[in-house]
């Protein structure tokens, strides 16, 4: 299963996204595009701490936050609340999933599962008995006693 298809199944989950510039975004994941662009709502945006060796690199992030209509964060905590954010896929460093997420059910690929059901390798309904043995060829009919 591709990573993007897995992320598409995480709709309405609370995730934390860390960006390549050090910004941390926490919010509810609404959708993920094939290019891994993520749309989040009810967002808390934490800007990275300014470094002394760079000239006001945090100012650019603050200016873009101001232009989008977000609330101006205080200088001490660098946290802003936004209603909506669209994150470009190539700026994402990592996506942190919640601990309560059931990964086993999300990692099942329905297309692959349906193709295995059609080929007869797995049963459609777990309550039904299998009609043929594993060792017998699939194209032969079962023998009936005379």
Swiss-Prot record:
Family annotation (Pfam families): LSM
Domain notes: C-terminal extension may function as a nuclear localization signal (NLS).
Domain Sm, residue spans: 2-101
GO biological process per UniProt: 7-methylguanosine cap hypermethylation; mRNA 5'-splice site recognition; mRNA splicing, via spliceosome; spliceosomal complex assembly; spliceosomal snRNP assembly; U2-type prespliceosome assembly
UniProt name for this protein: Small nuclear ribonucleoprotein Sm D1
Cell membrane as UniProt keyword: no
Primary site of residence: nucleus
Gene Ontology cellular component annotations, sorted alphabetically: catalytic step 2 spliceosome; commitment complex; cytoplasm; cytosol; nucleus; pICln-Sm protein complex; precatalytic spliceosome; Prp19 complex
Subcellular location: Nucleus; Cytoplasm
Region listing for Disordered, in residue ranges: 118-146
Species assigned in the record: Saccharomyces cerevisiae (strain ATCC 204508 / S288c)
Sequence motif Nuclear localization signal, residues: 128-144
Organism superkingdom: Eukaryota
SMART domains: Sm
Note, other: Present with 2400 molecules/cell in log phase SD medium.
Family classification: Belongs to the snRNP core protein family.
Subunit structure: Component of the Sm core complex, present in spliceosomal snRNP U1, U2, U4/U6 and U5. The core complex contains SMB1, SMD1, SMD2, SMD3, SME1, SMX3 and SMX2 (Sm proteins B, D1, D2, D3, E, F and G, respectively), and is probably a heptameric ring structure.
């Amino acid at each position: 299963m591709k990573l993007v298809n897995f992320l598409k199944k995480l709709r309405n989950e609370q995730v934390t996204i860390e960006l390549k510039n050090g910004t941390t975004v926490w919010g509810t994941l609404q959708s993920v595009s094939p290019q891994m662009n993520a749309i989040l709502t009810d967002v808390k945006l934490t800007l990275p701490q300014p470094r002394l060796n760079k000239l006001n690199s945090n100012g650019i992030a603050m200016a873009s936050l101001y232009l989008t209509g977000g609330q101006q964060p205080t200088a001490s905590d660098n946290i802003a609340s936004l209603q909506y954010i669209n994150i470009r896929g190539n700026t994402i460093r990592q996506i942190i999933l919640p601990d309560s997420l059931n990964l086993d059910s999300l990692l099942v690929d329905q297309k692959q599962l349906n193709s295995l059901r059609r080929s007869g390798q797995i049963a459609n309904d777990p309550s039904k008995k299998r009609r043929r043995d594993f060792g017998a060829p699939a194209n032969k009919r079962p023998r009936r006693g005379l």
